[in-house]
Amino acid sequence: MLETGRKMKALGLLSGGLDSTLAVKLMLERGIEVEALNFVTPFCLCRKGGCGAAEAAKTFNIPLKMVSAGTDYLRIIRKPKYGYGKNMNPCVDCRIFMLKKAKKHAQLIKAEFIFTGEVLGQRPMSQHRGALDLIERKAGLKERLFALYPVDFCQKLRQKRKGSWTNRSYWTLLGAREKDNLS
């Protein structure tokens, strides 16, 4: 709850995959009002008749705005400043692009921060501490971007910070080991 008496509000980047869906659930469990943003790219793998992001938004009863990534996105993937990840995906450049757009939307809806389903250590190119810091800085979201962190990192951080929230929220999720997250 904010000093004004209203609930804290956050904008979540929701792909509809497990990690972003869990991130939404975690925010809602903490009493944070959530609105979601989903980027539709030419490479979107949504099933006919349904999209994972739309299904998750409906399940959690949260507003979802679908945004076409557009031609700017295509320019970025043709010549990414930070290079390609596995399978030719320009991970870092895509995250910066999407988060810059998300920042504008967050301002419109008066969200205090933005969160993603990024999990520290899950992807070697874009989901390590250095890359997440770069993405946060280049997107202009210093201290306004929250991501998910694995158990061992959380435990070390809690010891260091005595369990308090600082610039980010640190949750216990295990990254690529999705079976553990589902139990």
Features from the language model and the residues they span:
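ATP-dependent adenylation/nucleotidyltransferase module used to activate substrates
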Residues: 1-183
